[in-house]
Amino acid sequence: LGIEKFSREVEEEWKQMDGGGLTLDHSVIDEVRSRFSYPAYEKLPHMPDELKQAAHDPLFERWRKNSVFPHKVQGYSIVVLSLKPVGGPPGDATAEQMDAVADLADRYSFGEIRVGHEQNLALPHVAKRDLPQLFKALDRLGLATPNVNLVTDIIACPGLDYCSLANARSIPIAQELTRRFANHDTADLIGRLHINISGCINACGHHHVG
């Protein structure tokens, strides 16, 4: 078809679907929204003094650049906790780390932790003023690897090491790749890259969208 013709056909199909029977009524959306409560956000500045001071620390800045994402409420950020240390099995965390993360969530994120298919954790409501202290705590726990969305942020299924359905090993490949690209400057130079590894055709590692 070619990209231009395909784009036109998608637009034509959308015109037929838009406003049709699959469109959600606003009353349904409002009803679902009513089942969720928002945290008690404070009115905070966009750039607090704590963040300005911490910006002089290159380790903090590298982590902030790769692990901290915009929030819809001013003064807050979303923080992704990478579970992809160099040489470690992707997505693994110890019981001690999870206990500590639960405490950090209570202290900095209204008690909320989220788990994504990327095999990382997220603290969804962190005040920007708290980012420097949170970074120090995560660094002590080994959870401040600044590689989110980079070449070493690899998704891998358990593979043949743990899964009876697999016909190939996934984890050792992921571990070796993280060692190969362990230098953070190299990973930054490569830029945003998603490597997904599956040990069989069931594609639990989402290799088809890597």
Predicted feature residues:
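Peripheral terminal and linker regions in Fe-S/redox and tRNA-modifying enzymes
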Residues: 1-210
